[in-house]
């Protein structure tokens, strides 16, 4: 049994972490922090936790920081910039850190400072941090002290592109043209739990809109995934268009590419099936079937469909996930399982909720 702490337990990802870790047979949640709710039981704020967790929120003071250093793993479900203030002291004490914000996702300090408008507090630790996408970085995660949990959109994008880039790296010719278009839609929970006019019921219901078209913070993370994580041997230009749709949770990304003559000769359905044959959380749909967001709701599953149109020389990959689970808290637990040598599906092997 390992001791876990959750810093920032009142946001949607924090709530999901409590839900998932409370059911994990090898984890004890020994500390839960919130400045705004210190002294309050978690199940008083979130009735869904009644009978599951009666832990009391603590403030993040000096005494709490000392307690964090006695844990085996600390999850940061906090705004960007919080984890990097504490990570160095925690790792020096032998504590493993999983950050669900962006502090340890981007390896480039210049990119981090540009997109998040703040200086990095521990650039040396950033150099050793591991990007927490188990389907690609499993071996590195197993030996990591600090894991940067991926963003929700990049999870769909990078896993949707992985079989293509890997197949292309084995060839002497490009299989897809340079331009990649990612048209992504997220439920409103992806924007967080804070009060916002855009998330007001009257504003978000019966409404559908694009946002951050000029540039979203997840774009450099996707570009890093293609160029470095997947180590593409060819250059690609990614156009990323995020949208907010009137549903609570769920994400669907459509990835559009043009095939070269060599790419049109490939059987991309087979490529995807072979690439993910051993991945228990990734389901490649049979040819002609397309996933919907409800099929992965409240689960750590990610479903992929592949559509190849050789007449138009086009390849479309459709990816769905629950943005709060595989796109956030579930993936964090999956990373924890890898870091501590547990079965990767432990605490995560449950069916999606239907309807």
UniProtKB/Swiss-Prot annotation:
CDD domains: AGPR_1_C, AGPR_1_N. Transmembrane segments: none annotated. GO terms for biological process: L-arginine biosynthetic process. GO terms for cellular component: cytoplasm. It is found in: Cytoplasm. Keywords: Amino-acid biosynthesis, Arginine biosynthesis, Cytoplasm, NADP, Oxidoreductase. Disulfide bonds: none annotated. Pathway: Amino-acid biosynthesis; L-arginine biosynthesis; N(2)-acetyl-L-ornithine from L-glutamate: step 3/4. The keyword RNA-binding does not apply. GO terms for molecular function: N-acetyl-gamma-glutamyl-phosphate reductase activity; NAD binding; NADP+ binding. Its main location: cytoplasm. InterPro entries: AGPR_AS (IPR023013), AGPR_type-1 (IPR000706), NAD(P)-bd_dom_sf (IPR036291), NAGSA_dehydrogenase (IPR050085), Semialdehyde_DH_NAD-bd (IPR000534). Pfam families: Semialdhyde_dh (PF01118), Semialdhyde_dhC_1 (PF22698). Its EC number is 1.2.1.38. It catalyses: N-acetyl-L-glutamate 5-semialdehyde + phosphate + NADP(+) = N-acetyl-L-glutamyl 5-phosphate + NADPH + H(+). The active site is at residue 152. It comes from the Bacteria. Catalyzes the NADPH-dependent reduction of N-acetyl-5-glutamyl phosphate to yield N-acetyl-L-glutamate 5-semialdehyde. Belongs to the NAGSA dehydrogenase family. Type 1 subfamily. HAMAP family: ArgC_type1. This is N-acetyl-gamma-glutamyl-phosphate reductase. It comes from Psychrobacter arcticus (strain DSM 17307 / VKM B-2377 / 273-4).
